[in-house]
Amino acid sequence: MSKLFSEYKLKDVTLKNRIVMSPMCMYSVENKDGIATDFHFAHYVSRAAGGTGLVILEATAVQEVGRISEFDLGLWNDEQVPALKRLVDGLHYHGAKAGIQLAHAGRKAVLPGEIVAPSAIPFDEKSAKPVELTKEAIKEVVADFKRAAYRAKEAGFDVIEIHAAHGYLIHQFLSPITNRREDNYGGPAGNRYKILSDIIKAVKEVWDGPIIVRVSATDYAHGGLQLEDHIPFAKWMKADGVELIDVSTGGLVNVAPPVFPGYQVPFADEIRRGAGIATGALGLITRGEQAEEILCNERADLIIVGRELLRNPYFAKDAAEQLGETIEGPKQYSRAWK
């Protein structure tokens, strides 16, 4: 059997293969209430039917002010749980594990009213200027991640991912470009890491399942975070109980990175080796042979697929065929699934 289609354990959760659907915002909430819709059900469950091992839902806001837009999913209140539970049940029906990415947009929120950030620095000249979070407000953000994690558990999710990448709130704290604070949340790397550490520890108080953290391994900007900065961050995350790091790049500033097949894989490789922690690789991974090479050369532990799963819900089936394997599909499709 190929490594791509071997099982993988995240703590006590066993994935049937190493294909993960990347969290990707769909901006499809209908009533600006954060509640998942029929679109979300069809979108995610179809990828589970296609053979994906772990489906991670898009950035789901822990506070109403933490949405990227008014059309994002949320877990800031109990009314948002039932629709997510229905979705999780659909994923489980098809043999996939269910993950959810808990997030706060910080200064990248495009919402009416006040937005917040570690420091009062806007994303760009066209963006609203955020209000600097007080220490009390930071503690409330941490508490809301904990509350959202509890609701995720109530909905039946198997895995939680904390979004610390792409220029959103936690990433804003981590990077010296966006964090100019002079208290114990700013300055040295250990201080800038504090909010993420506090969130991980708070989540673990109500959640005993695996925790993944998504990071941006480089800011692609002078004075920003580079790969070498993420090795100590990754070591601290491992010590705090994180199972795996989902390694992306960019998003903090308005810079277009160089993009080519597998362009982010070297970052996952270096963090894996430098910090001794499992990683997920992503970045234009589109074929089974490409994914298999990454795993067999121990450059990452999981393959996180984004745009290719938007184009093809049956990526897992096609990847298996490319590797000379056959995987079991939905029994309803047996006449065509060969």
From Swiss-Prot:
Signal peptide: none annotated. FMN binds at S22, P23, M24, C25, A59, Q101, R214, G306, R307. It comes from the Bacteria. Its EC number is 1.6.99.1. It catalyses: A + NADPH + H(+) = AH2 + NADP(+). It is an enzyme of class 1 (oxidoreductase). GO terms for biological process: response to toxic substance. Substrate binds at Y27, H163, A164, A165, H166. Its cofactor is FMN. One of its GO terms (molecular function) is FMN binding. Keywords: Detoxification, Flavoprotein, FMN, NADP, Oxidoreductase. Catalyzes the reduction of the double bond of an array of alpha,beta-unsaturated aldehydes and ketones. It also reduces the nitro group of nitroester and nitroaromatic compounds. It could have a role in detoxification processes. Homotetramer. Belongs to the NADH:flavin oxidoreductase/NADH oxidase family. NamA subfamily. This is NADPH dehydrogenase. It comes from Listeria monocytogenes serotype 4a (strain HCC23). The gene is namA.
